[in-house]
Amino acid sequence: MYLEDTIAAIGTPVGEGGIGIIRVSGPDVPAIARRIVRRVNENGDFVSHRFYYGTVVDPESRDTVDEVMAVLMRAPRSFTREDVLEIQCHGGYLVTRRVLDAVLQCGARPAEPGEFTRRAFLNGRIDLVQAEAVIDVIRSKTEAALNLAQHQREGRLSERLKAVQGCLRHSLALVEAFIDFPDDEVDPASRVEIEAKAREASGRIEELLEGFDEGRVLRDGVSVLIAGKPNVGKSSLLNTLLQEKRAIVTSVPGTTRDIIEEVVNVRGLPLRMLDTAGIRETEDVVEQEGVRLTLEKIPQADLILFVLDGSRPFDDDDRMILAALAERRVIVVTNKSDLPVTLRIPGELEGVHTVAISTATGAGIDDLREAVFETFIHGRAIDSREYVALSQTRHRDALVKARGRIAVFFANLAAGNDLEILAVDLRDALDAVGEVTGETTPDDILELIFQRFCIGK
């Protein structure tokens, strides 16, 4: 990647649409704009951030390519902090390709995936946390996930990380001051200040780490597998949660043979719901394969909804399923609460969260949604504008490393080890936090991060 060249890409999805957008960034943008954008009733230089109506013309033949709106944004007042040209043309595969080709004929090169965002990062407009949040904004499936991503894109998580870095730099500056003046002893007041700032940094890191599990599930969603014997209402439960008829429901046992997957939004938490084949002993070869797939999926799920028929006794098929759920996160769902209750919950399930529902009447469904939500989001106000959380494993791992280096610092401080050793510990902690924000992130990790982006972003 060369920041001194000019890049271009189509910034809208391929296919028919109302408009297509071609983005161009780099030093040749003003020359490209003058060469291919023919403005109506306008002459002279482009005024920054003003929309112009006109046409894009082929740079060689001067034939009209399309009717467009175009805006040139002068550096540094653009997304990449470079000169940027955005051309809005008619949507469609061929016309957007022709406009892009006109730009490329003027010397621009095709952009790599995520290269516009990468330039914004390398030019200091955003840090790496904000860059990663851009793709999370695009891929968000719920309002809560979008809010979390937007908060990160706006820099709220970055502000908390800067506060951690500020504490560590404060401690490090004091330590290095005494290293520079070896004749001076570390006085008690300075030692207290060094220790206090390091503890504050550690506490701030701990607060961020505590919110990781919730941030991760908001970003990535969780897999929830509906398990149970045939005809207990698993498919009816999926349809009820979806509020549409997605799975076939009949009175014939074994109707569901394959795994059906759908996404359900529960208060902003994306649930990947898996409706599975009823688990039982069977001679049917196809049904056996469905049971095998279900048992294979159980260990991979984040949560199991173990559905029981409240109007029938707990039997051997239920017990076989219970054995497969050992050490899994489970909510017991007793369906058919509108019928006389015959089921007795076995002792092995005592203490497991149980919700009584009726898919026929809808009773208890809101209670079930709340139980699933609280399993992953422990009372936090995820819809609050103040909600900020870690959501990337990369961030969590780097902060765990930073916390570990601070712990080593305290051990060396207590042992009375040399100031140089204490300084190394604090620098290592700072470097670990810098891996999150991009200040010390290795190039190979940067490559992996920006490869996840689409071309044009």
Swiss-Prot record:
Enzyme class: hydrolase
Chief location bin: cytoplasm
Tagged with keyword Signal: no
Positions of K(+) binding: 231, 250, 252, 255
An example Gene Ontology biological process: tRNA wobble uridine modification
Binding-site residues, (6S)-5-formyl-5,6,7,8-tetrahydrofolate: 23, 86, 125, 457
Free-text remark on how the cofactor is bound: Binds 1 potassium ion per subunit.
Subunit text: Homodimer. Heterotetramer of two MnmE and two MnmG subunits.
Binding site for GTP: 231-236, 250-256, 275-278
Localization annotation: Cytoplasm
GO terms of molecular function: GTP binding; GTPase activity; metal ion binding
Disulfide-linked positions: none
CDD domains assigned: trmE (cd04164), TrmE_N (cd14858)
One Pfam entry name: TrmE_N
Function: Exhibits a very high intrinsic GTPase hydrolysis rate. Involved in the addition of a carboxymethylaminomethyl (cmnm) group at the wobble position (U34) of certain tRNAs, forming tRNA-cmnm(5)s(2)U34.
Domain TrmE-type G residue range list: 221-377
Transmembrane stretches, start-end: none
Residues that hold Mg(2+) according to the record: 235, 256
Organism domain of life: Bacteria
Enzyme nomenclature, EC number: 3.6.-.-
Source species of the chain: Geobacter metallireducens (strain ATCC 53774 / DSM 7210 / GS-15)
One GO location term (cellular component): cytosol
Swiss-Prot/TrEMBL cofactor(s): K(+)
Family matches, as InterPro entries: G_TrmE, GTP-bd, GTP-bd_TrmE_N, GTPase_MnmE, MnmE_dom2, MnmE_helical, P-loop_NTPase, Small_GTP-bd
HAMAP family for the chain: GTPase_MnmE (MF_00379)
Keyword field: Cytoplasm, GTP-binding, Hydrolase, Magnesium, Metal-binding, Nucleotide-binding, Potassium, tRNA processing
Protein name: tRNA modification GTPase MnmE
GN (gene name): mnmE
